[in-house]
């Protein structure tokens, strides 16, 4: 009890984040299955469009704030950053504990918002006037706002902790450009969180006062403007999607360089600059989510151009990963499969992103399933594949146990087929004009929706199989005798699992 509730150990807190993220991920997956069941055939299954929208909203919030962020930043970040830096722990261990323990109440508030009155059926963007007191009477949206506040404070505190750790707790000889790529990725992610979340907090606080205190920030009747909310929200929302993917970039860099038998990734400095560029550019492209609100043509031209420029540093990363793989004998280990799947599918998602960055095309494709397909390719096959890659790669280090390699490979192929079958047809639906966030659709769209829903069942089966893989590893207790690879990074020089206090004295790194 003492160990888990009052923990100040970065490994224990990281493990808590993993367990919480896995639990939330199962809730989020269940919600996505409800969505695909509703859309599996024309006509109504749930029977109430408000309930459908509540499910969609909760699915998005849970997957983003309670699955991807806790696992990538909280789980892998806590576990690996101090060990990779040679630091005894995080800079603020008790703050670290507080950051975690704000998430369960936050999730509770979000689930409560779905269960009172008619729920928050606003979509994850929570746009007014739909989220106003008139269209959404009752406490649902207010509870969702408080949930976001808590999750946001948790992330900001975590970000401060990571930034301080990375700046202050490096060994003397580790200059900033020699830090491991994953540490860089988490550091940039933390800066993005620190700069973007306060803007979201401001926006939803104004929405809260609009709903309850009779202000009119977003109500035209009182001189407000709903477009202001969209600008504030997307100024957070766009950096947020890079927050979700950057730690994945860092992990994939480590996995590919290690599994390729290279001592470092190709173009390490270029990789760092690319991540920095993505982080900076992520803040100046937010209005590409709003091409349909009636902006000037020159504004749209700027946001189109700026969005396309992000493709350049992203391309640098893709080609550097391919460069790292060059000349190696590819060993198809499970972690390598996930990393290769990540690179390929993230590239596909990035290409549809370049399509959508054209404002003229986006006006037609906005709010269709093409957009859904695009961001699920980069999230459901980018962030999630990175999580899976990192998990199967570092599981032996974190637990000291090895998983069944054959089962993991089978799981990868089922999952790969499942997610592609789910989301690839949605490109066609979007091009055919099927809009997002509707519980029903004309019969014309039936065939691709049936295939999409079949794919979601496959992914669900794959998820169950992965839970079995973890159970099997825990039960079989195949203890690691030695590492499968030569260590590409300092964390593999530790015992499996590492000691409670990884570094008893200050480390000295002479050379890499």
Curated annotation (Swiss-Prot):
Mg(2+) binds at residues 366-367. Heme a3 binds at residue 374. Keywords: Calcium, Copper, Electron transport, Heme, Iron, Magnesium, Membrane, Metal-binding, Mitochondrion, Mitochondrion inner membrane, Respiratory chain, Translocase, Transmembrane, Transmembrane helix, Transport. The keyword Acetylation does not apply. Pathway: Energy metabolism; oxidative phosphorylation. It catalyses: 4 Fe(II)-[cytochrome c] + O2 + 8 H(+)(in) = 4 Fe(III)-[cytochrome c] + 2 H2O + 4 H(+)(out). It holds the Pfam family COX1. It comes from the Eukaryota. Fe(II)-heme a binds at residues 59, 376. Its cofactor is heme; Cu cation. Ca(2+) binds at residues 38, 43. GO terms for cellular component: mitochondrial inner membrane; respiratory chain complex IV. Its main location: mitochondrion. Binds 2 heme A groups non-covalently per subunit. Binds a copper B center. GO terms for biological process: electron transport coupled proton transport; mitochondrial electron transport, cytochrome c to oxygen. There is a cross-link at residues 238-242 (1'-histidyl-3'-tyrosine (His-Tyr)). It is a multi-pass membrane protein. Belongs to the heme-copper respiratory oxidase family. This is Cytochrome c oxidase subunit 1. It comes from Artemia franciscana. The lineage of its organism: Eukaryota, Metazoa, Ecdysozoa, Arthropoda, Crustacea.
